[in-house]
Amino acid sequence: MDKTRIPVIVGTGQVTDTTSKPEEGRSPLQLMHDAVKLAAADSGAQDQGAALLRGLDSVTVIRLFADTLPRFASPFGKLANAPWSIAQRVGAANATDLVQGGDSQVVILARACERIAQGERQAARVGGG
């Protein structure tokens, strides 16, 4: 392994909204975006991590449970491409996007780390909703 390409987690963020009335609550996409901003700020990078976010070349989102099975579908529809939406919101214009499902959170993190270690990626965002 190239010692200059050791992947590290530089920031984490989690957002929940258990107190808002349903009609006033944030959408799953807004909650994800808020978590991304918290993770960027947690990184300690300048400008609350804005440059770090713009430099993302990979954005992955774990598929929402409500989008998995029709019987759990939200009456408000589903997110067609949450990773793309997050990439656009944070200015990561060159990021590839991927929706991943199942119990694969750690697999996705491992893949992101592997791609960084191999030089295929510079920075990656992994998250769910």
Question: Where are the regions that the model predicts?
Answer:
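Conserved phosphate-binding catalytic cores of ATP/NTP-utilizing and phosphoryl-transfer enzymes
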Residues: 106-114
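Glycine-rich anion/phosphate-binding loops
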Residues: 30, 104-107
